[in-house]
């Protein structure tokens, strides 16, 4: 995923936190805000130390990024997403993580497709 598609600055994270709409399931919390002036969506990730050691957290981040990248064409372009991983996601498979990402994005009414 290109760096222009990522939320990196703490100020940008705070904007999403403060003006957010949120949805959660057992594995993820998703905060999102609409940004009509944007040309593409942006993604911010947060994986706490409760998820596991550093290599576990990086593994989870990679799986989330890959899942979002596969859904890129079905996401609106004018949105900032902040995905927070809960500890239950630590030892799950890539397929399961993608299913849960799809589930939480549908709950948030963000995903445009019915099923993938």
From Swiss-Prot:
Provide the transmembrane region boundaries. Answer: none
Keywords per UniProt: Endonuclease, Hydrolase, Nuclease, RNA-binding, tRNA processing
Highest taxon of the lineage: Bacteria
Entry GO terms, CC: ribonuclease P complex
Q: Which GO terms describe its molecular function?
A: 3'-tRNA processing endoribonuclease activity; ribonuclease P activity; tRNA binding
Q: Name one GO biological process term.
A: tRNA 5'-leader removal
What the entry lists under InterPro entries is as follows:
Ribosomal_Su5_D2-typ_SF, Ribsml_uS5_D2-typ_fold_subgr, RNase_P
Q: What is its EC number?
A: 3.1.26.5
Reaction catalysed by this chain?
Endonucleolytic cleavage of RNA, removing 5'-extranucleotides from tRNA precursor
Is-annotated flag, keyword Transmembrane?
Answer: no
The family annotation for this protein states:
Belongs to the RnpA family.
Subunit structure and binding partners: Consists of a catalytic RNA component (M1 or rnpB) and a protein subunit.
Its annotated function is as follows: RNaseP catalyzes the removal of the 5'-leader sequence from pre-tRNA to produce the mature 5'-terminus. It can also cleave other RNA substrates such as 4.5S RNA. The protein component plays an auxiliary but essential role in vivo by binding to the 5'-leader sequence and broadening the substrate specificity of the ribozyme.
| Name this polypeptide is given | Ribonuclease P protein component
The major lineage groups are: Bacteria, Bacillati, Bacillota, Bacilli, Lactobacillales
């Amino acid at each position: 995923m290109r760096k222009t598609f990522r939320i990196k600055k703490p100020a940008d994270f705070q904007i999403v936190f403060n003006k957010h709409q949120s949805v959660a399931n057992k594995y993820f919390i998703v905060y999102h805000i609409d940004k009509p002036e944007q040309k593409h969506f942006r993604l911010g990730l947060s994986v706490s130390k409760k998820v596991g050691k550093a290599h576990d957290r990086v593994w989870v981040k990679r799986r989330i990024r890959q899942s979002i990248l596969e859904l890129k064409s079905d996401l609106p372009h004018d949105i900032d997403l902040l995905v927070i991983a809960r500890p239950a996601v630590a030892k799950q498979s890539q397929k399961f993580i993608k299913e849960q990402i799809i589930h939480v994005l549908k709950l948030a009414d963000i995903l445009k497709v019915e099923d993938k």
